[in-house]
Amino acid sequence: MDLTKLTAHELKDMLSNKEVKAEEITKAFLDRINLVDNKLGAYLYVSEEEAIKKAKEIDVKIEKNEELKALSGIPVGIKDNINVKGMQNTCASKILEGYTSPYDAHVTEKIKQEEGIILGKLNMDEFAMGSSTENSAFKLAKNPWDLERVPGGSSGGSAVAVAGSEATLSLGTDTGGSVRQPASFCGVVGLKPTYGRISRSGVVAFGSTLDQVGPMGKDVEDCALLTSAIAGLDKKDFTTADKEVPDYKKSLTKDIKGKRIGIPKEFFGDGLDKNVRKSVEEAIKVLEANGAEVKPCSLPLMDYALSAYYIISSAEASSNLARFDGIRYGYRSKNFKDAKDIYLKSRSEGFGDEVKRRIMLGTYVLSAGYYDAYYKKALKVRKLIKDDFQRVFKEFDAIVSPTSPTTAFKVGEKKDDVMSMYLSDIYTVPISVAGVPAISLPCGMVDGLPVGLQIISDYFKEDVLFNLAYNYEQSVDFHKMRADF
């Protein structure tokens, strides 16, 4: 049996029944990483010794018949912008090359408390800015379904690790679609929770009012398992909500009778690949056949979401990335004349093109002459988009759409076409702007590549997402597909 192909809940059952040891599972994944990651590029750092040490500790507990925790013995990969004590945290940027984290992010602490085995740090677009993981300063991540195609981004390494069987579970971050879009491209399940459901403490900030940590897994149950483990109030992050975290496993029922689902016409317009549309429409029919009430709806302000997002996120990035100055840690230019020159050259040489593009855009829209015309107006548009979603959720329990307008595109295909790259997030960005939760799960294959179905719900209604996603998943077999790599 190939342990790397199994889900987290399958591995949990085997561990509980003493059919396998945690060390055996961990070594199987480390062997898999050593075998395939030179081609897939999911990992930027592998913590082999520490992972085996933790696995042995869990095996001792199992032998003593101690109660297992939620993630005991389950291999997890962590995106390289989420701090793990003693491991590198580079954000896939030259400017942080060699930086080792002195502390754990809140979500990392929670995984350790639940005895998950952290295998290492995962590849990403630099500072989480990108939709293909081609902006990593260190290596290219490739889609396990087709090595000539991108895995999506910015959490490309997180999706590749799960789809390529290099981790059972992974954590990514989602600012405008960076968990959902790579989940769609790689055929795994990825959740962007409600803003404030999961702590951002210890996560390197890109857009502080948009960033969210999101779990990825091979199926909906795995995703629910990891969400339950890491969600909840954190006093170090004042944006986290003081709301009880439900046991999301209880949401995993096949009963969706009477659930009201809206189909927004704006998500099915020009630019949507006809075969992706067909797969999503077939998925909607399955939900309807299973008892959901499906009706059309409209989100007329969606067309403004992408523009508002890039203004707001770039403005926040300009502020957040000002701390990387070449003085305190990270990359420092070797050729400089004075202190001002250190800042200028260290940042110019340390940041990649996409990061510099967004810093410049953000600085521009925050400047005295343009603040009202761009940034302030974008905030007003954001409020209207939130109101739009709230209006729809008074009538519907959830909204269903494609996750991305296409399947995974070829490496290099959009690298120099900035607008085309940005448009790959056109269906995920509005959800981030509104701050509501959404899940992506596989709903078909087009020319050997996965298609993602996006289900969106109201604030803190992740249980509705898991319920609908699980119902659909159990009616089809797409979650059982494994990339033959």
From Swiss-Prot:
Keyword Ligase: yes
GO molecular function: ATP binding; glutaminyl-tRNA synthase (glutamine-hydrolyzing) activity
Highest taxon of the lineage: Bacteria
Cellular component, GO, one term: glutamyl-tRNA(Gln) amidotransferase complex
Enzyme Commission number, as recorded: 6.3.5.7
Catalytic activity: L-glutamyl-tRNA(Gln) + L-glutamine + ATP + H2O = L-glutaminyl-tRNA(Gln) + L-glutamate + ADP + phosphate + H(+)
InterPro entries reported for this sequence: Amidase, Amidase_CS, Amidase_dom, AS_sf, GatA
GO BP term (any one): translation
Catalytic residues, chain numbering: K79 (charge relay system), S154 (charge relay system), S178 (acyl-ester intermediate)
PROSITE patterns for the chain: AMIDASES (PS00571)
Function as written in the Swiss-Prot or TrEMBL entry: Allows the formation of correctly charged Gln-tRNA(Gln) through the transamidation of misacylated Glu-tRNA(Gln) in organisms which lack glutaminyl-tRNA synthetase. The reaction takes place in the presence of glutamine and ATP through an activated gamma-phospho-Glu-tRNA(Gln).
Family membership noted in the UniProt record: Belongs to the amidase family. GatA subfamily.
The name this protein goes by in its record: Glutamyl-tRNA(Gln) amidotransferase subunit A
Lineage: Bacteria, Bacillati, Bacillota, Clostridia, Eubacteriales
Gene: gatA
